[in-house]
């Protein structure tokens, strides 16, 4: 009888141990895999959602429309001016075997190259990506995919020559 009590106690302990193991945190949802950074995967309209971990200040915005066919972009932004601006240019993607995917670009109308090249990471099929400045890893931008640039922003950024 004494051995049966010990056996029963061990059996109860074993059942509790199995119960706790079944409730472990290994059931977390798997992380969404990143897509390859190609012009085709970047194609479309992107809104700057966060800059350095913070949402954009009220009244500021940045939308970038990337065209995969000819690797051009149109940017609609309002950061450093009281008016929105429409900026165009071209971009290039390079896959560095040591650093990863890097996007760089140049502006049309002789305005020069982008101030920075950016590491592109966490490009997700669900519609977001991270750009980190190559020469300043504290400069981090999170973009989210959107259907289109809002009409009021297109109107605000319309070139004066188009009116």
Segment roles from a protein language model:
Residues 100-163:
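Beta-sheet ligand-binding and adhesion/scaffold domains
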Residues 16-41, 146-163:
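Bacterial Sec-dependent N-terminal signal peptides
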Residues 51, 76-80, 96, 106, ...:
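Surface loops and adjacent helix of pleckstrin homology
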């Amino acid at each position: 009888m004494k051995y049966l009590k010990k056996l029963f106690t061990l059996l109860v302990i074993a059942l509790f141990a199995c119960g706790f193991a079944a409730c472990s945190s290994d059931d977390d949802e798997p992380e969404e895999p990143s897509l390859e950074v190609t012009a085709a995967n970047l194609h479309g309209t992107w809104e700057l959602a966060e800059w350095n971990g913070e949402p954009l200040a009220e009244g500021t915005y940045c939308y970038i429309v990337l065209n995969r066919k000819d690797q051009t972009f149109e940017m609609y932004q309002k950061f450093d001016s009281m008016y929105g601006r429409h900026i165009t240019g071209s971009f290039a993607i390079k896959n560095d075997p040591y650093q990863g995917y890097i996007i760089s670009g140049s502006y049309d109308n002789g305005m020069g190259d982008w101030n920075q090249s950016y590491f592109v990471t966490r490009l997700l099929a669900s519609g977001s990506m991270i750009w980190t400045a190559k020469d300043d890893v504290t400069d981090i931008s999170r973009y989210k995919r959107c259907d289109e640039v809002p009409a009021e922003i297109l109107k605000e950024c319309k070139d004066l020559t188009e009116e």
